[in-house]
Amino acid sequence: MALSKISPTEGSRRILEDHHIDEDVGFALPHPLVELPDAYSPWVLVARNLPVLIENGQLREEVEKLPTLSTDGLRGHRLQRLAHLALGYITMAYVWNRGDDDVRKVLPRNIAVPYCELSEKLGLPPILSYADCVLANWKKKDPNGPMTYENMDILFSFPGGDCDKGFFLVSLLVEIAASPAIKAIPTVSSAVERQDLKALEKALHDIATSLEKAKEIFKRMRDFVDPDTFFHVLRIYLSGWKCSSKLPEGLLYEGVWDTPKMFSGGSAGQSSIFQSLDVLLGIKHEAGKESPAEFLQEMREYMPPAHRNFLFFLESAPPVREFVISRHNEDLTKAYNECVNGLVSVRKFHLAIVDTYIMKPSKKKPTDGDKSEEPSNVESRGTGGTNPMTFLRSVKDTTEKALLSWP
């Protein structure tokens, strides 16, 4: 789209609209549906009762009894996202069950076939991803009330009490707090194209302010998520079957593929926010085999296609970093660095969160009730399949190196 042929404001609005980025909630799914048609009530009945079914040892039996339902009655993006979310929950619960060594290597065809059909329609993988459990897994208790933790809930739950509610909703609220930064991105690109230094400086400042607000929301994770419950219970259900010691060959989707497939579990790397800002600011992460850059590139396949395309759009936009350097303007350089420092600050806090919720619990002596793997295994892998501390340190360090010196 040639931004010069239309007003900057209209151009920015169209870019966001074209890439399914909402004015109010950013990359999150606006107004998710909460009910499936009656024909799909068997899925809903299981998905809404996972903790009880797992505790009673009935989960797998109930899943195996489910009828094979056609996805033809699921028309419209939001309805398909809700069904994909429900089947994602059921799949994770079926594979991991109580989180012990009793892991299923085959997903029955009555779930696998409709799940993979929906995945193909949506352009998402057949595993519970960030796009499902964070971006599409919410509702307001009072529809006319505010978008606050106290007025929100998730649609489905895993064992662990309110741990997943806290984890998913705080992650969602971080997305929403950062949405003004995403809304400012087309303005940044337009300002660079028009060589409008004042507009660019203001847009960069807006991004930095939004990141600071997102970090403040991120801090609430500690208010609502217990580290031991997250590590020993919830983390299991978010784990995927790529680089998995318990599913080294992946998961067989019966009736869909003849061989097992590997997919990563939900990861913050699947959020489009920070990848968008990296691309915008020209932050290049360490490349090579099994590198942060390779992992982040792979995580794009877990994003909704429109959001993935937004990253491609940004990669073809005028380079902001080079423009700022070429202007030799102190205020503009400070505004750029303000954005970079905002990203560094969020990433430093993310490191602290990983330390609290993964590293420290992993070093505690396991009790008989613990469901997690031995510490030697968990320390080297997060739910997305990477070593979370090594990955985040590298990403944070690379971000810091992007700061521009002045004069």
Swiss-Prot record:
Region (Disordered): 362-407
First and last residue of the signal peptide: none
Residues bound to heme b: 350
Catalytic reaction list: D-tryptophan + O2 = N-formyl-D-kynurenine; L-tryptophan + O2 = N-formyl-L-kynurenine
Keyword Cell membrane: no
UniProt-listed InterPro entries: Indolamine_dOase, Trp/Indoleamine_2_3_dOase-like
Keyword field contains Metal-binding: yes
GO biological process assignments: defense response; inflammatory response; kynurenic acid biosynthetic process; L-tryptophan catabolic process to kynurenine; multicellular organismal response to stress; negative regulation of activated T cell proliferation; negative regulation of interleukin-10 production; negative regulation of T cell apoptotic process
Mutant lacking the gene: phenotype: Knockout mice display normal development and function of dendritic cells, on T- or B-cells development. They display increased sensitivity to the induction of inflammatory and autoimmune reactions. They produce litters of normal sizes at normal rates, implying that compensatory or redundant immunosuppressive mechanisms protected allogeneic fetuses during gestation in knockout mice. Knockout mice display cardiac and gastrointestinal liabilities.
A single cellular component GO annotation: stereocilium bundle
PROSITE patterns: IDO_1, IDO_2
PANTHER family per record: INDOLEAMINE 2,3-DIOXYGENASE, INDOLEAMINE 2,3-DIOXYGENASE 1
Subunit and partners: Monomer.
Function, as annotated: Catalyzes the first and rate limiting step of the catabolism of the essential amino acid tryptophan along the kynurenine pathway. Involved in the peripheral immune tolerance, contributing to maintain homeostasis by preventing autoimmunity or immunopathology that would result from uncontrolled and overreacting immune responses. Tryptophan shortage inhibits T lymphocytes division and accumulation of tryptophan catabolites induces T-cell apoptosis and differentiation of regulatory T-cells. Acts as a suppressor of anti-tumor immunity.
UniProt name for this protein: Indoleamine 2,3-dioxygenase 1
